[in-house]
Amino acid sequence: MLTCSDCSTWEQFVNYVKTRCSKTAFENWISPIQIIEETQEKIRLEVPNIFVQNYLLDNYKQDLCSFVPLDAQGEPALEFVVAEIKKAPAQPIAPREPQESPAETFEESKDFELKLNAAYRFDNFIEGPSNQFVKSAAVGIAGRPGRSYNPLFIHGGVGLGKTHLLHAVGHYVREHHKNLRVHCITTEAFINDLVQHLRLKSIDKMKNFYRSLDLLLVDDIQFLQNRQNFEEEFCNTFETLINLNKQIVITSDKPPGQLKLSERIIARMEWGLVAHVGIPDLETRVAILQHKAEQKGLHIPNEIAFYIADHIYGNVRQLEGAINKLTAYCRLFGKTLTESIVRDTLRELFRSPSKQKVSVESILKSVATVFQVKLQDLKGTSRSKELVLARQVAMYLAKTLITDSLVAIGSAFGKTHSTVLYACKTIEQKIEKDETLTRQISLCKNHIVG
C-alpha cells in the first residue's frame, strides 16, 4: 500500500484521482465525498447520495485497493453513510410566494440541452428503401406528437441518419406546434444533468422540468447500459411522460431487446414503434452523394457518383467525408472531377471484399445485419421462413465469394454440400424475379468485412 506521512490514505487517493480525471468529473463525483473516520482497519465516508457511492466503486475500485485498507476478501474496507438532507428551521408562515411557472423552470434547466442541428430537417433527408419506413414514422409523430407511435424507437448503425431524424422531429414540432415544449438531449447529458442536480440537492427541480415537457428527444440511449441507478430515474421520467401522452423519441445503435438494460425499461421502449434505419442501397447512396455535392458546389457526373457509391457503402458520414475530400482537392488544384482523381483521392475510403479475405463468419455477420436477424439464430436450426432465406443467401454468398469447395463451405455451415448447392440454385432462381432480394444481396456484399 502506498503511504505518505503528511496525509491520510484517503487524501492520498483523492490527490491521485485528481490528476487522472477531468475537473468536471472530479467536482461531480469525488469532491463531494467527505471522510468521517479513518482507522487501520477501515475508512468511513459520507456521500451525498447512492449514485456517488456506486460511481466511486464502479470506476476506482482497483485504485482504491492501492490506497485504502482491505477487508478479508481483498475488497476496499469502506463504510458509506449517505448524508441526510438538512432541514431548514421552521419559519413563521408568510404570504405565499408566486409559483415558478413551467416556462421559467424550462429556461433555467437548459444547461445540458442539445441544440438542434439546423441542417437536420425532413426536407433534406434522402429517402430510400432502407429508411423509408422510419422516416414516415418520424413525420407521423411530428405531425401528431403523443397521439401516434409513442415512444418512437429508432435504431441502426453509426452514420445512417438516426440523429438527423431525431433533430428533424424537433424542428418540425417547434415550427408547427409552437406552444409545445421540446427538449433534445444525449443520454450522457441526461446523466450529467442528474448528477448535477443530485450534487446541488435540487433533484425535484429536474424532475419537474422533465415532466413538464411535451416532446423529449433522447440520442444514443445505449449509453444508459450498466448504469442501473440512472436507468431507474430515466425510466420513471419515461413512464410519467408516456402516461401524460407526451411524445418521446429515442435513438440507439441496437434494438431494445439487445440493450443491456432492465426488462422494465426494455418493455417500455417496445410499447410504441421500433423502427430500423438500414444501410442505404446503391441508388440512395448516389442520391446522397449528389445532394451533398450540390451543397458544396461540386459538380459530380452520374457515372462518377455511381463509381463512388459502389465503393463506399458503410454509412452516410463516409459519403459526406468523401465529398468534403473531393471538394477540397478540386478547389485547391483547380481540377475537374474525374474517375482517376476519385480513385487516388479516396483510396483509403474504398473497400472491396476479395475472395481471399472473405470468411464465412464475415458473411454471416453481414447477412444478419441486412436481414435484421440475430447472428446466433442464423447459425441455429430454426426453420422459420425469414431465417431459412437468410441462411440460403449466406450459402449463396459463400459460394460466390469464397474459393473453397462446396464440401468445405457446407462443413462451415454445418450442412452437406448438396444443401449448399440447393440453396445456391434457389437464390439464383429468386433473384431473377425478386428485385428486393437482389438489392439485399448487393447490400450484403457491400457490408462484408474481411
UniProtKB/Swiss-Prot annotation:
Single Gene Ontology MF annotation: ATP binding
Residue sites binding ATP per the record: G159, G161, K162, T163
CDD domains, per the entry: AAA, Bac_DnaA_C
Subcellular location: Cytoplasm
Pfam families on file: Bac_DnaA (PF00308), Bac_DnaA_C (PF08299), DnaA_N (PF11638)
Chain intervals for the UniProt region annotation (Domain II): 85-114
Region Domain III, AAA+ region, annotated ranges: 115-330
InterPro entries attached to this UniProt entry: AAA+_ATPase, Chromosome_initiator_DnaA, Chromosome_initiator_DnaA-like, Chromosome_initiator_DnaA_CS, DnaA_C, DnaA_dom, DnaA_N_dom, DnaA_N_sf
Database matches in PANTHER family: CHROMOSOMAL REPLICATION INITIATOR PROTEIN DNAA (PTHR30050:SF2)
Notes on the domains: Domain I is involved in oligomerization and binding regulators, domain II is flexibile and of varying length in different bacteria, domain III forms the AAA+ region, while domain IV binds dsDNA.
Family, as annotated: Belongs to the DnaA family.
Protein name: Chromosomal replication initiator protein DnaA 1
Lineage: Bacteria, Pseudomonadati, Chlamydiota, Chlamydiia, Chlamydiales
